[in-house]
Amino acid sequence: MAIESEVLVIGGGLAGITSALAAADAGADTRLVSYKQSTLRNASGLVDVLGYTPSGDGPVVDPFDAIPSLPDAHPYRTVGVDTVRDAMAFFDAHAPRYQGHHTDANALVPTHGGTVKPTARYPASAAAGLASDDRDTLLVGFETLPDFNADHAAAHLESAGVPFDVRGVTVPFPGDLRAGAKVTRYAGLLDANPQVSVDGTERPLRLALATRVADAAADADRVGFPAVLGDDDPAGVRDALADHLGAAVFEVPMGPPSLPGLRLSDHLFGALEAAGVRIETGNPVVDADTTAGGVETVYVEKNGARIPNSADEYVLATGGLVGKGIDSDRDAVYEPIFDCRIAHSDDRYAWFDDDAFGDHAFAQFGVRTDDTLRPRDDDGAAAHANLRAAGAVLGGYNFAAEHSGSGVSIATGYAAGTAAAEAIHDE
């Protein structure tokens, strides 16, 4: 007997989460099935809408103003700029720890590599570090955290022409942490704030850390730490360090695994549970039964068995080539669950550019849809009346070059989930 729901979302990344939240918010009995842990756990925690145009121009000042000029096949053009705005407002309502919603303009956020990233939304923990702020800045690295070289990042920011003086310093992290310790270990210690011994004196860990940074930070108006400043109470950790240092404190977004990404993932999955969405993770959807009327059943592989799941409406949010929502062999590129059409050249050597930094065709491989996000068949009609696609499984854009991945996931996830719920109510 099949496990039933009104809307079944396949995929646990930002697009899948947003789809499920939107469907549940619209009153649909919703279920989310995800094979792997959410890709948010490896994301920086920054939420981009559009940082650069497809031709490489940028940084884009106002991403919403740029959307009407994008190619017709771009997912933003499919859903429309008004839906993108509505979707970002929906995200804002479910992510209260994020800032940037006060303006349409992109913020410029320094990263751990010393680059400046245009982004539409950013964690509150990064707010005091914006590159548009001219306050003198100290970046702090830890000897046991090699992923953040504070001197290197400061030098890169200075060479990029930021409007503030910036320096870097590296200090030992108080307590007994081995090199390469997980970011969650740093965060857990800063949350717990245990007594630690520094130079023979016992003191709370947060105070001990501030003491080690204090001399270097004496002339700084703000101090940036790697993004490990607590998980349960990051605001409390930042406030305590700021009080001890007499300067604003912010986090510098890091590469994977990313604590801001983990925080966002945990928060959004909590929102799913609060909305009544049923969640199953760790088991892949491997096949589907379809008829001329649409998708009837999908099969989840669990402990060697194929468990049928049925719904009135389905959302495909399994990711792109990296997430295996799109796959390929030597002869073809394909979508493995529903066999949705993926437009590509028969010549596999045309899938990429000889220049490593060139315009690779594979970067835009994905499902092409109608204006309600239903995948098209070879004739351009909806392949399945009750199936919609969202996020990186979609084609027609290069999320890495454009810095548009999060925004496309939110906008198309919101549109797909809302449309799925509305289709049920219209029946």
Swiss-Prot record:
Keyword Oxidoreductase: yes
Catalytic activity: a quinone + sn-glycerol 3-phosphate = dihydroxyacetone phosphate + a quinol
Keyword Flavoprotein attached: yes
Recorded metabolic or biological pathway in which this protein acts: Polyol metabolism; glycerol degradation via glycerol kinase pathway; glycerone phosphate from sn-glycerol 3-phosphate (anaerobic route): step 1/1
EC number: 1.1.5.3
Xref: Pfam families: FAD_binding_2
Organism domain of life: Archaea
Keywords assigned by UniProt, alphabetized: Flavoprotein, FMN, Oxidoreductase
GO MF annotation list: glycerol-3-phosphate dehydrogenase (quinone) activity
Transmembrane segments: none
Necessary cofactors: FMN
GO BP terms: glycerol catabolic process
GO cellular component entries: glycerol-3-phosphate dehydrogenase (FAD) complex
Similarity annotation: Belongs to the anaerobic G-3-P dehydrogenase subunit B family.
Matches recorded under NCBIfam families: glycerol3P_GlpB (TIGR03378), PRK05329.1-5 (NF003722)
Protein name: Probable anaerobic glycerol-3-phosphate dehydrogenase subunit B
Native source species: Halobacterium salinarum (strain ATCC 700922 / JCM 11081 / NRC-1)
Lineage, opening ranks: Archaea, Methanobacteriati, Methanobacteriota, Stenosarchaea group, Halobacteria
